[in-house]
């Protein structure tokens, strides 16, 4: 479904199908806002839905084709890199003394969609974006929609067989990765 169709569904729900009170571009702004929120939640709760991979050769540095919101994994010659830094949301650097094959798994930024663009999302998540738009237009609290997004992403993740563990995180982050305890 393209973005204009998603926005038309929101127009139906707010009772403004003649588009007298709001323009499609007004609702497009809410769509992009909701899409950015959803993309961040996808990175946290169901990364396989939006995971991208980039490979290149380099000496301790690789530049991604676009900005990312999360780096899931960095490998050098098929071995995990534990210590790396992300610069300007696009460049990954680490200590190396010779050229190697570098592979990065990451979550891209959502970017800004235009009306004619495809949403690229499953229908269930498009419906949640419609809900988000309606809530923003009506100035309602979006915490309920956000909770529904999290629940939907966890259900999708469970359905993909990716959630067979309990996630434990400490109070203080210290920049470490999360610990998954398999059940």
For each predicted feature, which ranges?
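Internal mixed-charge
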Residues: 1-9, 29, 36, 40, ...
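Solvent-exposed beta-hairpin/edge-strand motifs
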Residues: 62-79
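Generic beta-strand hydrophobic packing signal
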Residues: 52, 71-74, 133
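Surface-exposed ligand/attachment interfaces on beta-rich extracellular proteins
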Residues: 51-65, 113-123
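Short, glycine/acidic-rich hinge or "gate" loops at secondary-structure transitions
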Residues: 21-24, 45-52, 146-151
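Subunit-assembly interface segments of extracellular/virion macromolecular structures
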Residues: 9, 13-24, 33, 37
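A generic structural signal for short, non-catalytic loop/turn and secondary-structure boundary residues
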Residues: 57, 64-69, 95-99, 174
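Extracellular ectodomain segments of secreted/surface proteins
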Residues: 36, 40-57
């Amino acid at each position: 479904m393209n973005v204009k169709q998603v926005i038309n569904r929101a127009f139906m729900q707010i009772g403004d199908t003649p588009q007298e009170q709001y323009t499609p571009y007004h609702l497009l702004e809410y769509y992009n806002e909701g899409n950015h929120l959803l993309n961040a939640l996808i990175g946290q709760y169901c990364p396989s839905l939006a995971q991208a991979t980039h490979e290149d050769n380099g000496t301790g540095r690789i530049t991604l084709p676009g900005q990312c919101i999360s780096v899931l994994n960095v490998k050098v010659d098929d071995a995990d890199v534990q210590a790396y830094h992300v610069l300007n949301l696009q460049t990954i650097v680490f200590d190396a003394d010779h050229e190697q094959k570098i592979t990065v798994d990451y979550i891209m930024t959502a970017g800004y969609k235009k009306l004619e663009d495809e949403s690229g999302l499953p229908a269930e998540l498009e419906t949640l974006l419609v809900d988000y738009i309606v809530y923003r237009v009506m100035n309602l609290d979006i915490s309920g929609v956000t909770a529904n997004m999290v629940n939907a992403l966890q259900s999708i993740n469970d359905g993909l067989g990716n959630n067979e563990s309990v996630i434990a995180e400490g109070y203080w982050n210290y920049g470490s990765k999360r610990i998954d305890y398999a059940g």
